[in-house]
Structure formats: C-alpha cells, structure tokens
A protein has these predicted regions:
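Short, well-structured hydrophobic secondary-structure segments
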Residues: 37-73
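Conserved NAD+-utilizing ADP-ribose enzyme module
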Residues: 1-2, 9-34, 59-61, 70-195
Length: 195
C-alpha cells in the first residue's frame, strides 16, 4: 500500500542509520503539544492489535501516514497551510507498506475519538437526531461502552460526501514501524523560524 508519512528530518536520519524507525513518544509532536493524547492513542493501539496483529517488542505507539488527501490517493500537497506552517526541516517519505500491516481510518472522524465524543455515523439529519436521542437516554455506564464502540466507525473510509455526512476525504494510516526498504521517495520541506 502506497502511503506518505510526514516526519521531522531527524526521523529520516535515524531510518537511514538504523534501517528501521519506531515512534519515540518523547519526541512525537502530537504527544508533546499540551493535549492529552494517551487515551485516544492507546485506543488506536488496541484497535491495531485487534485488526492487524500485535505490536513488535518495544513499540509503544504507531507511525502515522496519509493514504488519501483531499479525496486523492497521492502525496499530500506540501504547499498547503497545514504543511507550510511547520518550523524546521521535515520530510514527506513515500513508502510501500504491506496492506495487512496497515490500519486505515478517516482522519476527520478520528476527531470523535480525540475529543471523547459519541460518533453516530448518521448519514442524514433525522437519523442523527434519533441516534443522539437514543444515546443521551442511556445510563452513564452504558453511554461509555456505546461511545467507544461508535468510534469503530472511523474505519469506514469508503468515500461519502453528502450535505450531512462526509468520510474518505482524508484517510490516515497507522502501522507499527517504518523500515528503510519500504521507502520509495523522500521530499524535504519546511522552514526555520524568522527573527
């Protein structure tokens, strides 16, 4: 499966030196930006173990990559604000990872997990209103179970774009580790802080 992972240049250096790279939680941008990502990341790890197999010894968190960006399965446009705003030199590493070693999910709907929200997955407003009413009527203990089960809808990545529901526009990929032999191409980008 062709994917694109955005990493600081240091990751590319480590990958070239060691032949393999695993997420270092102490240096991972999103794990150190003031938000509490432990619970959602641990949930994703549990889903990966259930769906693609146990993590290798020593792996704590997965490597993240793009599969689909703005409805297209191609390298993300590094000129967009999301990428241009990064300080320091970064790399977009094009990789080919075996399909059975990758778990795909909808990046926009991943925010239901990140924010600890119930995800109804409704495709139209009436369905949403019914789902929300049924969810809100549940006892608190049951709500937690139903909410966590609802998050599994993020793995539905078939493109849908309606007035009420969208999925598949941005598809992210997670896998346990990155190896040098998976690399097809590296593109450098980024900037340094102004004075």
């Amino acid at each position: 499966m062709l994917l694109w992972t955005i990493q600081p240049e240091e990751v590319w250096r480590i990958l070239r030196r060691d032949g393999v790279y695993r997420c270092n939680p102490d240096k991972a941008m999103h794990l150190n930006d003031g938000w509490d990502y432990d619970a959602p990341y641990n949930w994703m790890v549990a889903q990966m173990e259930k769906r693609i197999g146990k993590r290798p010894e020593g792996v704590i968190y997965p490597i993240w990559a793009w599969h689909t960006y703005n409805w297209k399965h191609k390298k993300p446009d590094l000129r967009t604000d999301w990428f241009r705003g990064r300080y320091g030199v970064h790399t977009c590493i094009e990789i080919d990872v075996p399909d059975n070693a990758v778990l795909l999910s909808d990046e926009e709907n991943w925010h239901f997990v990140l924010n600890d929200w119930y995800f109804s997955g409704a495709k139209f407003e009436e369905e949403y209103n019914r789902d929300e009413a049924a969810y809100e009527a549940l006892p608190e203990g049951k709500k937690i179970m139903v909410k966590k089960k609802s998050w599994e809808r993020i793995f539905e990545v078939e493109p849908i774009d309606t007035e009420w529901h969208r999925q598949g526009c941005y598809v992210q990929a997670v896998f346990w580790e990155l190896s040098l032999e998976q690399v097809k191409k590296v593109t450098w980008f980024g900037r340094t802080k102004g004075i």
